[in-house]
């Protein structure tokens, strides 16, 4: 959870480091670079998490700042088809391809998580039956993790697979 500006910097640097050395931001914007757009979304996600966690309802400026950031975040959510909820994903999230959409409804996702396009982390039935993902996990293209499933650390979920039972770490 991002509670201080130091945490915010660490999360953003961890996310950016997963994408390697980037070109100038203006070139990424002009040519519509996929990694640039994804990093832009991740930065907005992290700032919105920070504003939400430090929200003081007595201070109207902080409330306004959070509302504006949340508006921009939801706009990018719809535009890029990346449904990543607040305060769920750890530092170092990497989304190599966002073309098919990414849908996350998880309890917790560990650090250095890789999720490709068309992946679904979803509930089965009620809202309590949602997956929990460990550290250094990779979800390949089209994979699904459905229900109250614990995926252990250092796991790889194969392309187009459906996970409905726990996966041990290793």
List each language-model region with its residue ranges.
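Terminal amphipathic alpha-helical/low-complexity segments used for targeting or macromolecular assembly
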Residues: 1-80
């Amino acid at each position: 959870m991002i509670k201080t500006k130091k945490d915010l910097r660490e999360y953003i640097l961890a996310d950016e480091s997963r994408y390697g050395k980037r070109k100038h931001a203006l070139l990424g914007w002009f040519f519509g670079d996929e990694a640039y757009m994804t990093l832009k979304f991740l930065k907005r996600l992290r700032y919105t998490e920070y504003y939400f966690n430090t929200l003081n309802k007595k201070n109207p400026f902080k409330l306004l700042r959070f509302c504006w950031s949340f508006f921009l975040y939801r706009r990018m959510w719809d535009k890029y088809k990346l449904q990543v909820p607040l305060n769920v994903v750890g530092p170092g999230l990497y989304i190599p391809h966002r073309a098919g959409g990414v849908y996350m409804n998880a309890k917790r996702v560990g650090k250095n998580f890789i999720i490709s396009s068309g992946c679904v982390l979803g509930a089965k039935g009620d809202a309590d039956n949602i997956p929990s993902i460990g550290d250094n996990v990779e979800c390949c293209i089209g994979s699904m993790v459905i229900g109250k499933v614990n995926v252990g650390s250092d796991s790889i979920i194969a392309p187009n697979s459906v996970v409905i039972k726990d996966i041990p770490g290793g």
